[in-house]
Design a protein with these regions (language model features):
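Internal, well-ordered domain-core segments that constitute the primary functional module
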Residues: 114-193
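Exposed, low-structure sequence patches enriched in small/polar residues
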Residues: 42-54, 81, 163-165, 172-184, ...
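Sec/Tat signal peptide C-region and signal peptidase I cleavage site
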Residues: 7-12
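Outer membrane beta-barrel
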Residues: 71-136, 264-270, 277-280
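Outer-membrane beta-barrel proteins
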Residues: 104-110, 150-152, 189-197, 248-250
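Transmembrane beta-barrel domains of Gram-negative outer membranes and organellar outer membranes
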Residues: 41-94, 104, 336, 340, ...
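Transmembrane beta-strand segments of Gram-negative outer membrane beta-barrel proteins
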Residues: 14-41, 47-48, 59-68, 90, ...
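Bacterial N-terminal signal peptides
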Residues: 1-6
Length: 571
């Protein structure tokens, strides 16, 4: 038997709500999942019998949740216990304090991770301000001689402030972040391989609106980043002007990131233009990761005509290698269009197009015509639907068609990576109201052609479902399917399947579910007189879950009791 332990966090609500919370609630659940599987083709890829049992117990004390759980599956045992990690956020009038593992709203280019420390926010109708200090990242300091040693990392501290103002559709926010690694937080043997870092980030975010139809939003940031805090310091007068908050070293660099959006909103029409620019090697130690070394320009527009026709389209282009230091420059263009027509209250037709174009240009090296990356992707879709409601029956018919082409545009290409796919589908749903039963019939066909290869698949299925009993707590469903697959000049296969399921809920605490599936499949060849459709798979499942409340001390009952005692004393 193998044992392993996991950590489950302890959660806490706003401290201002603790007095209103229930003093003690003990809840839990017990359950089991069981699967039996048999295949005439062998059991090499799945165990014939899989059993699991689990139990959960949660102690909630004045809003603090401490979960315990145990899980047993065949020969594996897992036990999880709570780790005390607090997050208190008391509020008083316009102030909110943060204690423990917390997060605060900052610019995405400045800070998007949580911190373990203290913070304070102040907000009124127009003005706002915040500040925090804490640990942004824990140290990883394993023994270097351990064969399973993790990648080391320093403990990272950070502090930041923000201030903002907003009125109507106009706003402005200023952000400041200072982050640095603690050199003594890892073993000396690691320090030659991993160097401590330091960062100073200044961000500005704002929005301007004109008469509710024209808006301009911008989000920019400048980052001063040092890759090695122990590298030699730059001693020039200009570099030492900001020594009190950031020491400029020979491993320091200054980078910029930002985006802007101009939007137009009119009656029945909207449009926007978007631009983003992130310099190479832009880093903020307050973010998990920021993609850099690219710029993007995008356009989008949409309108509604005659209250029936909805049109939308968008285009965006992206290019990397801004510093021209990569071997090659990659450009990508994404474009799409959509039209939806409501022919009547019962019928609707939607058509869509999506495209992508990728090309490669010169960088420090010149692109070779024979190996140049130049691809295009086209995708066309058409989806008509028809609904016919009635007193006894509801009918829904849906059709779908999609064609996708992925093609190499290199003039020396012979089409080895070209792929064309055609997918067709049809479904009919019948709702029999007197029986409270649904029936669904569906057909689908897919054909994919590649270089000297072709694959096709045809699927037909019938399914039904119904709920029983007065409370509708017994649900059943059944599906019968037929699937034919063919790889041209290689293989043909046919499979037939039946799936049955039932679920029952008893008194809202006990949940039972049963499932059974049977499939028969094998290779078939229509040119031969005999097929090999003799493989069978059988799967049976049984699941059970019991949820309970072991103990509950209610705050409301306690308050009523105190009021009753006070009233009796008064009398």
């Amino acid at each position: 038997m193998a044992c392993s332990w996991a950590i489950a966090p302890v959660c806490a609500q706003d401290i201002s709500q603790i007095a209103k919370s229930d003093p003690l609630i003990i809840t839990g659940s017990i359950g089991t999942n069981n699967t039996y599987f048999h295949s005439s083709a062998g059991l090499g890829y799945m165990s014939p019998l899989s059993n699991s049992f689990f139990a959960n117990l949660n102690f909630n004390i004045y809003g603090f949740s401490m979960p315990f759980s145990i899980y047993f599956s065949n020969d594996n045992l897992n036990f999880s216990y709570p780790q005390f990690s607090f997050n208190l956020s008391p509020s008083y009038k316009n102030f909110t304090a943060h204690i423990g593992q917390s997060s605060m709203p900052f610019s995405q280019y400045v800070l998007n991770m949580s911190f373990n420390g203290v913070g304070l926010e102040w907000r009124d109708k127009q003005f706002r301000a915040s500040a925090f200090y804490g640990v942004l990242r824990r140290a990883v300091n394993d023994n270097p001689d351990d064969p399973t040693v993790r990648i080391p990392q320093y403990r990272r501290y950070g502090w930041g402030i923000s201030a903002g103002y907003s009125k109507g559709g106009n706003s402005i926010d200023l952000y400041f972040l200072r982050a640095y690694d603690s050199e003594s937080s890892i073993d000396e043997r690691w320090r030659t391989r991993v160097r401590p870092q330091e960062n100073l980030v200044l961000g500005l975010k704002g929005q301007l609106s004109y008469k509710n139809f024209l808006s301009l939003a911008a989000n920019v940031a400048t980052s001063a980043f040092t890759a090695d805090r122990e590298s030699q310091q730059v001693m020039t007068d200009e570099a030492r002007r900001f020594d009190k908050i950031f020491e400029t070293r020979y491993t320091s660099r200054l980078r910029f990131a930002g985006d802007a959006t101009l939007g137009l909103t009119l009656k029945g029409f909207n449009a926007s233009i978007f631009y983003k620019y992130i310099q190479p090697d832009y880093v903020s130690l307050g973010t998990y990761y920021t993609s850099n070394n690219y710029h993007t320009l995008g356009l989008s527009a949409g309108t509604t005509l005659f209250r029936r026709l909805t049109l939308s389209a968008s285009f965006s282009g992206q290019e990397d290698n801004l510093a021209k230091q990569q071997l090659y420059t990659t450009r990508g263009y994404v474009y799409n269009a959509m039209a939806s027509l409501r022919i009547s209250d019962r019928m609707n037709v939607t058509a869509m197009y999506n495209g992508y174009l990728q090309s490669q240009g010169d960088g420090t090296a010149q692109v070779n015509d024979t190996t140049e990356i130049h691809r295009v992707l086209h995708s066309f879709s058409l989806v008509p639907t028809y609904n016919l409601p009635g007193e006894l029956f509801d009918h829904t018919i849906s059709l779908s068609a999609n064609y996708t082409e992925n093609r190499d545009l290199n003039k020396f290409s012979v089409g080895q990576t070209d792929v064309k796919t055609l997918a067709l589908g049809a479904s009919y749903n019948l709702n029999v109201k007197p029986w409270e039963t649904n029936f669904t019939f569906s057909l689908s066909h897919q054909n994919t052609k590649g270089f000297n290869s072709e694959y096709s698949s045809d699927v037909a299925s019938i399914s039904t479902g119904r709920s029983f009993l007065k409370e509708k707590n017994l649900s059943t469903s059944a599906t019968v399917s037929l699937n034919y697959n063919e790889v041209r000049h290689h293989s043909k296969s046919l499979s037939m399947g039946v799936d049955l399921s039932a679920s029952y809920t008893l008194k809202k605490y006990h949940s039972f579910s049963l499932g059974a599936s049977f499939s028969q499949y094998g290779d078939v060849n229509l040119e031969k007189t005999r097929s090999t459709l003799d493989n069978r798979d059988v799967r049976l499942t049984f699941n059970y879950l019991y949820t309970f409340t072991l103990l509950q001390v209610s705050a409301k009952k306690k308050d009523k009791k105190e009021q009753k005692e006070k009233g009796s004393k008064g009398r």
